[in-house]
Amino acid sequence: MPSHLSAAEQKQVQTVIDRARGDSTVPHSAQDSIPFQRMFPDGICRVTDNYYTKTIQFQDINYQLAQQEDQTAIFEEWCSFLNFFDSSIRFELSFMNMATDASNFEKMVRIPYQKDHFNPVRTEYSTMLRRQLAQGNNGLTKTKYLTFGIEAESMKQAKPRLIHIEIDLMNNFKRLGVRAKLLNGKERLHLMHDMFHMGDHDRFNFDWKWLPESGLSVKDFIAPTGFAFPKNRIFQMGGMYGSMSYLQITASDLSDQLLKDFLDMESSQIVTMHIQSVDQNKAIKSIKHTITELDRSKIEEQKKAVRSGYDMDIIPSDLATYGKDAKALLKELQSQNERMFLLTFLVMNTGETEQELETNVFQASSIAQKYNCNLRRLDFQQEQDRKSTRLNSSHIL
């Protein structure tokens, strides 16, 4: 900065320079908007300088078709599964309904002929599979993933702990009777590519050996043609329109049908649950503080009643209900080996047109209202929320 300028002039010049440089925190390309630093071949993803994740794909279990006793047993096993996660492990459950190219499915179900007498049987079976495909889920592929992550100072420190957690989780899935598979780096990139290219059916072509030869990064092989945010509640990802919403849970309890109804929608969408276990001591301390505040409010209401000449035992029903619920929760935490979890429930609806998108968002909102909850669309936070669905177990909002 020239020394002959006054302090006010120097400040003015610096303001112009900063404006020209732009905000370094704003993504300048589609690649910059993909929220991770590096993907390793073994499936470990470095999201930030000190945060690392892995992803497991898991299959369905016949919960809805099971008898009541079996459903109770499955639910108890699932509770034990969730209690495995301590406060140092963040995890994300992702449920994806994505439209796929019908021609690829037809190739998968086509049974090649062989030099024997069973070709007529193969033809009949292939025809039956194609007929079922045509009557199926509108070409939707429905998959489920669990992504878990930890904080560590380096890859060397993170890797052994992630492997240990992975082994425990795979054993927990096995006890539930659920088939599960760890995704390697290429499979995670393929999955993210499919998420970014929902509407164009662009094929994923990638090999690790291409990186040093081309000078490209893995993000160049998965990024869409671009991201755009034309309106405060809508974003564009390539040729697809999308909208992010969060579930506002206002019901006293949630039915296990809520998630099923979301996933039964016949449209491409991603439902994500970001879950963080709260440290047991902090959870108990927080509940005790809440009970103390409720008791203080109760005393204030009783004082008002006495001054007004009313019965002091008559207090607002909300106070009585909240106090009862808080004490029940404290008992569960202290004596029943329960954990407290923080949950963010996100829904990404999509559509090939804005009108189709709005129709799908309306349907999802109707499902939420059916269970006395609200689906709230985020104003001016579509990009941050969209990043939170990318299987990195890092909630950005």
Say what each PLM segment does:
Residues 391-397:
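Positively charged, low-complexity/disordered segments
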Residues 1-390:
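Extended, folded cores of ATP/NTP-driven motor/assembly subunits in large transport
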